[in-house]
């Protein structure tokens, strides 16, 4: 494919990606509201359309990215960079401007979201480190691994290559969360 950088077509692809992405979110929000309002069929149609918009956005995104979605390590790096921009630049600027215009409550929300974006960046960087050091499915000490498909529990330094209960691959294992 020809080089897109700097072309009107690149700008159009960016606009199409942004438009489809925003439409997907709006339709998802509206589906939730329709369901709460007692319109299950309308909610389902909003969700179906939201999924269509997601696929449209994916098509434009892939073209912007050279035809494919990159590997997980590259995606984690890009995600961390995006989150860094959001908390260090975008939301800081937005909070400052909201305050200057007298919208203190909105400024506080921007600042609150900036803190969340910082946590997102940190999480992505830790995950990237795990991928780069091949520490996603093995740890230095014993941990409790749980199959995300069937719930099987294994204690050890390494997740099994295959779940002995449901035969799903190692990719389905994670350290068992205890957030209850």
Where are these regions (language model features)?
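Non-heme di-metal
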Residues: 1-180
